[in-house]
UniProtKB/Swiss-Prot annotation:
Any coiled-coil regions, as ranges: none
Segments crossing the lipid bilayer: 44-64, 340-360
Lineage: Eukaryota, Metazoa, Chordata, Craniata, Vertebrata
Protein name (record): P2X purinoceptor 2
Gene for this chain: P2rx2
Function, in words: ATP-gated nonselective transmembrane cation channel permeable to potassium, sodium and calcium. Activation by extracellular ATP induces a variety of cellular responses, such as excitatory postsynaptic responses in sensory neurons, neuromuscular junctions (NMJ) formation, hearing, perception of taste and peristalsis. In the inner ear, regulates sound transduction and auditory neurotransmission, outer hair cell electromotility, inner ear gap junctions, and K(+) recycling. Mediates synaptic transmission between neurons and from neurons to smooth muscle.
Organism: Mus musculus
SUBUNIT field: Homotrimer and heterotrimer; functional P2XRs are organized as homomeric and heteromeric trimers. Homotrimer. Forms heterotrimer with P2XR1. Forms heterotrimer with P2XR3. Forms heterotrimer with P2XR6.
GO CC, alphabetical: apical plasma membrane; neuronal dense core vesicle; plasma membrane; postsynapse; receptor complex
UniProt-annotated stretches for the region Disordered: 406-485
Composition-biased stretches (Polar residues): 469-478
Length: 485
């Protein structure tokens, strides 16, 4: 005898059974089974969910979001700015060349509204500013010669000298003297600044749709000389008063001019290219970009200097710390045009999403309904095709679904064999042959239904009234596996 194979441990056997079951289930085919449940509450929930999904796709997806269009964001853009106006301080008139930085104009332009001037600076030695950390001193030993403070104005000489005013002392530095804050002068330029005008020329291009447009109307050449922007009357005259921009951003002009700030001019080009070109118009909005209530980062200022020589030898400069209103022009937008591909994709998504209602109602049906076990039994069937069906018995869907027992392929002990000819009682008119010896019937729907019903009744031990073939509806038994509740 062959040696017995060693038995696998219980864990290994369980893993093998699990793997075998997973492998077998992997090749199963699942198909939906239609069940009609006559329950108005469940039907109401189903239709309401479908209606909400349909409204969402029709109103929001297709009307609001215009998902039937192919879109392009981030248009190619060019910006040119030009500022005009004059102002004056206590003793000086300021024109555009002095208070606008940079002078060439672009997407960013700064308009100076207040300055701190340190005039006549020359290279030499002088007291360090008291604003510099650890610049105050009492003795020369408090100042280290050659020390360089990156937040300061120069290199320390090692001497402790009196400050520009008062009794305090600071370390002496080698720098442009006098240093800032020592002898600075303040000048306010914002008195007439609200009346400054800013021309913003903008043109955009959507390369996907080969569409271009600008924010200036094609009118007479002198049109821009006599107009200012108005959303209703002159939307294509992009000349803005500085006071109007600050007001639209919700800021106080005097406060903003004193401390400085950053204002964004946002131009939005949202264009529906299915409409005419005249419907594609720029929309302007204004808001402050720097944090207003953060003392460490609010405001806007920068420094620059003007250099000149005295007697052709000594180089001097005037240092200017400028506070101003910086204008940032920001352009964005989106263009859309009808396209067949996104339309088909979104329609398919909408039709698929309607099935969510059926999934939700199936979950309610199998979880919360009173007859959930009955519904679960009717909804799920496990089907196995017979390996060796009898050649004399037609394989029907009712047989495969298990609604009738399979026919015996051989006579068993429980079934009597067919009587040989000449033996047994004679079969008169109207007598019925045993099941095993009945001649095969034609595969019509009525005959198949009678066969399924008779076999089911024999299997269940009941005998319903025999229906008349010409009068009865053959759909009382469902050979297609469809259950109706």
């Amino acid at each position: 005898m062959a040696a017995a194979q060693p038995r696998l441990p219980a864990g290994a056997a369980m893993v093998r059974r699990l793997a075998r079951g997973c492998w077998s289930a992997f090749w199963d085919y699942e198909t939906p089974k239609v069940i009609v449940v006559r329950n108005r509450r469940l039907g109401f929930v189903h239709r309401m969910v479908q209606l909400l999904i349909l409204l969402y796709f029709v109103w929001y997806v297709f009307i609001v979001q215009k998902s039937y269009q192919d879109s392009e964001t981030g248009p190619e853009s060019s910006i040119i700015t030009k500022v005009k106006g004059i102002t004056m301080s206590e003793h000086k008139v300021w024109d555009v060349e002095e208070y606008v930085k940079p002078p060439e104009g672009g997407s960013v332009v700064s308009i100076i509204t207040r300055i701190e001037v340190t005039p006549s600076q020359t290279l030499g030695t002088c007291p360090e500013s008291m604003r510099v950390h650890s610049s105050t001193c009492h003795l020369d030993d408090d100042c280290v010669a050659g020390q360089l403070d990156m937040q300061g104005n120069g290199i320390r000489t090692g001497r402790c000298v009196p400050y520009y005013h008062g009794d305090s002392k600071t370390c002496e530095v080698s720098a442009w003297c006098p240093v800032e804050d020592g002898t600075s002068e303040n000048h306010f330029l914002g008195k007439m600044a609200p009346n400054f005008t800013i021309l913003i020329k903008n043109s955009i291009h959507y390369p996907k749709f080969k569409f271009s447009k600008g924010n200036i109307a094609s009118q007479k050449s002198d049109y821009l000389k006599h107009c200012t922007f108005d959303q209703d009357s002159d939307p294509y005259c992009p000349i803005f008063r500085l006071g109007f921009i600050v007001e639209q951003a919700g800021e106080n002009f005097t406060e903003l001019a004193h401390k400085g700030g950053v204002i964004g001019v946002i131009i939005n080009w949202n264009c529906d290219l299915d409409l005419s070109e005249s419907e594609c118009n720029p929309k302007y909005s204004f808001r402050r970009l720097d944090p207003k209530y953060d003392p460490a980062s609010s405001g806007y200022n920068f420094r620059f200097a003007k250099y000149y020589k005295i007697n052709g030898t000594t180089t001097t400069r005037t240092l200017i710390k400028a506070y101003g209103i910086r204008i940032d022009v920001i352009v964005h937008g989106q263009a859309g045009k009808f396209s067949l591909i996104p339309t088909i994709i979104n329609l398919a998504t909408a039709l698929t999403s309607i099935g969510v209602g059926s999934f939700l109602c199936d979950w309610i049906l199998l979880t919360f309904m009173n007859k959930n076990k009955l519904y679960s039994h009717k909804k799920f069937d496990k089907v196995r095709t017979p390996r060796h069906p009898s050649s004399r018995w037609p394989v029907t869907l009712a047989l495969v679904l298990g609604q009738i027992p399979p026919p015996p392929s051989h006579y068993s002990q429980d079934q009597p064999p067919s009587l040989p000819s000449g033996e047994g009682p004679a079969l008169g008119e109207g007598a019925e042959l045993p099941l095993a010896v009945q001649p095969p019937r034609s595969c019509s729907s009525s005959a198949l239904t009678e066969q399924v019903v008779d076999t089911l009744d024999q299997h269940m031990g009941q005998r319903p009234p025999v229906p008349e073939p010409s009068q009865q509806d053959s759909t009382s038994t469902d050979p297609k596996g469809l259950a109706q509740l």
